[in-house]
Curated annotation (Swiss-Prot):
This is Bifunctional enzyme MtnB/MtnX. Pathway: Amino-acid biosynthesis; L-methionine biosynthesis via salvage pathway; L-methionine from S-methyl-5-thio-alpha-D-ribose 1-phosphate: step 2/6; Amino-acid biosynthesis; L-methionine biosynthesis via salvage pathway; L-methionine from S-methyl-5-thio-alpha-D-ribose 1-phosphate: step 4/6. Pfam families: Aldolase_II, HAD. In the N-terminal section; belongs to the HAD-like hydrolase superfamily. MtnX family. In the C-terminal section; belongs to the aldolase class II family. MtnB subfamily. It comes from Bacillus licheniformis (strain ATCC 14580 / DSM 13 / JCM 2505 / CCUG 7422 / NBRC 12200 / NCIMB 9375 / NCTC 10341 / NRRL NRS-1264 / Gibson 46). HAMAP family: Salvage_MtnB, Salvage_MtnX.
Amino acid sequence: MRKPLIICDFDGTITTNDNIISIMKQFAPEEWTALKDGVLSKDISIRDGVGRMFNLLPASLKEDITAYVLKQAETRPGFKEFVSFLDEKGLPFYVVSGGMDFFVYPLLEGIVGKDRIYCNEAAFTSRNIEIRWPYPCDGGCGNDCGCCKPSIIRRLKGRDDFVVMIGDSVTDVEAAKCSDLCIARDYLLRECEELGLKHAAFGDFRDVRRILEETAEVKEWMSEQKRQELAEVKKELAERDWFPATSGNLSIKVSEDPLRFLITASGKDKRKETEEDFLLADEEGRPAETGHALKPSAETLLHTYVYQHTNAGCCLHVHTVDNNVISELYAKEKQVTFRGQEIIKALGLWEEHAEVTVPIIENSAHIPDLAADFAGHLSGDSGAVLIRSHGITVWGKTAFEAKRMLEAYEFLFSWHLKLKALQAYHV
C-alpha cells in the first residue's frame, strides 16, 4: 500500500491570482515584464528572474506591498474545508511555494501550520528588496528553481509514497514530473497534456477533494487508516468486556460521496482480532466489495441511517448489563434523564446544571421497523439512543468522540444503578 503525499503550490493555486504578478503590476517599473517573459520562456531561471523582479522594488515599500497583497489576495473556494478534510483523514499535506514569507504565512495562518509550509524569504534591510532562498535545488535538480519543489518532494517522500502535486504554473512543472498524479489548472494543465503526465483538471478545491477521493491509491490508504482506527476502538471496548456473546457492532465512515463505511462483520467474536473483523458497506448497507463471504452486522441499517441523516463519522452499538437494565427501568417513560454529574461535560454540555436525556425506543426483531423508529431520534452530529433490552447506539463526528460519549453514558448508567441500589438498601 502506498501512502499519499500531497504537495500544493500557493500562488495561483491556493489563491485565485498569482500574488507575485499582482505585486509587480502594482509596484514595479516596466522592466519586470521582460523578466517575467524570460521566466515563462525558460530563458531565465525562476530564481534569477524572481530575484531580479523583487530587486526592482524599494525596501521602503514593505508596508505598502504587504498591506496591498493581504488585502487583494483571495483564497480559492473550498480550500479551508479541503485542509480540514485532509487533517481528518490523516493525509500528509505540505504547501511548497515560490512565493514570499511576508504574504504566504499570514494568508495561511490558522489553516496550515508553518511547519508544513516551504517558501522563500524576502529581506527588506537593503535599499531594494532582496530574496533569500532557503530551499535551493539539490544535486538532483539543476534548474535553479529558487524554492525547489522537486528537491523538497525528494526530502519529504518515503520510498513507496504516492505523490500528488497540485499546481497551476511554470514553477510547478518540474514537481509535476516527480509526481504520480498532478492535479492541475491553467499553464500547468497544458504542460501536463503536452508531456503526457498523469493528471486531472481542477477548478477549485472541491474538485481537488473529489479527485483525491476517486483516486485508487488514496482511497485504499484512507480505508486502511479508518480500519486501523476502528480496530483500536474495538480493542478498547473488548477490554471492557462490552461485546458479550458476539453482540454489538461498530462502524466508521470512509467516504461521503458515495457513502462507504466499514462495519463489523456479523457473528464474529469481537474480543478477538482477525483480518476479517470489518467489511466495507455501501449507502444501502450492502457489502461494497466482492471476494469474501462476510456479512454486515444485523443492525447495519441503523448505521446507514446515522450516516445518511447526520454528519457523524463513527457509530457504536454495545450491549451491557447496565444499559439494558436502564432501558428496562425507564421504558414506560421512553427516556431517561441525568443531571448533576461532572462527566456530562464529556457529552459537550458545559453548563453548571446541565442535564442530558437519552431516548428509549422499543426493540423489534424486524430491523426496518426498528430503524424507522430509531431514525426519528437522529438529530445533530452526535447523540445516543437506548433500545429496550437491546443496548445503546452512540454516534459522533469522529471515532474518538463516539467512544468518549459511549464511555460517559455507560458511566452514568452504572452510577445511576448503584445509587438506586444504595438508596433502596438504606430505606
